[in-house]
Amino acid sequence: AGTAAAFGGVSDTLTALGIPCACCDDGPSGMRLDCGTKAFSLPNGTLLASTFDRPLMTELFTFMGLEMHTNQVDCLLGPGMNIHRHPLNGRNFEYFSEDPYLTGEMASAELAGLHSTGAEGTIKHFCGNNRETRRHFLDSVISERALREIYLRGFEKAVKKGGAKSVMTTYGQVNGVWTAGNYGLVTGILRDDWGFDGFTMTDWWANINRRGKAPDKSDFAAMAMAQNDVYMAVSYTHLTLPTSDL
């Protein structure tokens, strides 16, 4: 109880298909258990990256994975690995660095620790989430070269070297398309170019759109066509079922 959400086999229909239910939890600086259960607080991402110590990072998140196992949590909503583009970004402390190489190395070391215990980490926010002000509507206009060499390089390393199997998209847009339904990012780069074969999710209650169209949180078709697997998060009160299914 008190975790961020559950996904997968959350209904009788899905469990009947053999799909297990998984539990995810914030966050990059230690587990957040809103039920009141105490958890250890970890150093933030910037401090950890300042050590340049991969083995220490792996050891720390091996411990984290064991704590997740104790609390029946399958998937950590971290590491956060956006680039320090501006010193006033409200979540810079959560992210590793302005350097994409260091970001990818530290994320890979963190994932190694989690994976050693059977836990998974979710690399986020994919991508261009480099400020907090109006981040639900932010449009990060980025050239192809800057995107691949700076803003995506750490994610690429986390996928190829770190073996990441869970990715979270952002609240905002990249070049006019909200990342929750951005085919070029989620399929073209992540899956096709990098060979990612894992699980993707949106950030919580994210906007979705098609190029040139207004955002719509219920445009799940655009999300599905982009191969973004799960919209986070919904409750039964948000679902409208056909009469025949009631």
Name these PLM-found stretches.
Residues A1-S244:
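Glycoside hydrolase catalytic-domain context in secreted enzymes
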